[in-house]
Amino acid sequence: MMLSLNNLQNIIYNPVIPFVGTIPDQLDPGTLIVIRGHVPSDADRFQVDLQNGSSMKPRADVAFHFNPRFKRAGCIVCNTLINEKWGREEITYDTPFKREKSFEIVIMVLKDKFQVAVNGKHTLLYGHRIGPEKIDTLGIYGKVNIHSIGFSFSSDLQSTQASSLELTEISRENVPKSGTPQLRLPFAARLNTPMGPGRTVVVKGEVNANAKSFNVDLLAGKSKDIALHLNPRLNIKAFVRNSFLQESWGEEERNITSFPFSPGMYFEMIIYCDVREFKVAVNGVHSLEYKHRFKELSSIDTLEINGDIHLLEVRSW
């Protein structure tokens, strides 16, 4: 299962607001809720509520209250309602929502939290205060126009597959004992089919809460040349790319439209090998290209990963 916004199910188009609807399946880890809409010019606030039931009196519990507000500088307030009492507010001041602008909200359900991206950018994390298995209703209220609501139900996110398709781990001690939900770092694996145009490597993981940096490297095992060194540095929000050829580092590339990683977030990084370059996407959003400096693509046969992440799954095809 790859994180994709294209194969949504149970899509509801142009619902009337306030909208209250039953969620058609259980919110297992890996489920996505995708809401596309537009903020009217006179909006003061709107909210998306993941609820346990739809009762008005007494008011249904709200596991996740996601509430963009537009007064003054604007913010997003998140909270939980239990037994008609609100808990502690979590406020995000760096808000992507603007009046008279369209938006796409992607709420990803993880084991211990919700992860929200807006317009393709990571926005916030919200730890579960009510188990997501209790959520069965979606409510949208306030001044907002909604074009569509869609779901992608998946249950295999964050369930570890050590090395599945087309990978052989080099250091066997990496393989977790049953019940450990992550792969050991440093991680090294041999690609059963070496790199070449059309080949893909996928790395799934979770960034540590206090992460400084991590790296994903594609190497030519024989020469130890690093064809592609991907090095997100969270402490300075730089996504550094380079190659290590003939025992020396080349020139770093850092230009990027927006830094895609954030402490605590779940990510899927897709590395696609094209004829002239590598293309890298994070959580379904294209991030960068890197022109091949190491030309013998068929010699690239090794993947190494290390740094401040929980590594959950690595795949290649």
UniProtKB/Swiss-Prot annotation:
A Gene Ontology biological process term: T cell costimulation
Effect on the protein of changing residue 190 to H: Does not affect localization to cytoplasmic vesicles in case of infection by S.typhimurium
MF-aspect GO terms: carbohydrate binding; integrin binding
Keyword Cytoplasm (UniProt): yes
Positions annotated to bind a beta-D-galactoside: 249-255
GO cellular component, one term: membrane
SUPFAM superfamilies linked: Concanavalin A-like lectins/glucanases
Record-marked site positions (Critical for binding to sialylated and sulfated oligosaccharides): 59
Keyword ATP-binding: no
Compartments (UniProt record): Cytoplasmic vesicle; Cytoplasm, Cytosol
Subunit note: Homodimer. Interacts with CALCOCO2/NDP52. Interacts with PDPN; the interaction is glycosylation-dependent; may participate in connection of the lymphatic endothelium to the surrounding extracellular matrix.
Domain Galectin: 19-152, 187-317
Tissue specificity comment: Ubiquitous. Selective expression by prostate carcinomas versus normal prostate and benign prostatic hypertrophy.
Residues the entry annotates as binding a carbohydrate: 69, 79, 89
Record keywords, A-Z: Autophagy, Cytoplasm, Cytoplasmic vesicle, Lectin, Repeat
Domain characteristics, as noted in the entry: Contains two homologous but distinct carbohydrate-binding domains.
Reported function: Beta-galactoside-binding lectin that acts as a sensor of membrane damage caused by infection and restricts the proliferation of infecting pathogens by targeting them for autophagy. Detects membrane rupture by binding beta-galactoside ligands located on the lumenal side of the endosome membrane; these ligands becoming exposed to the cytoplasm following rupture. Restricts infection by initiating autophagy via interaction with CALCOCO2/NDP52. Required to restrict infection of bacterial invasion such as S.typhimurium. Also required to restrict infection of Picornaviridae viruses.
Protein name, UniProt field: Galectin-8
One Pfam family hit: Gal-bind_lectin
Gene that specifies this protein: LGALS8
Main location (coarse class): cytoplasm
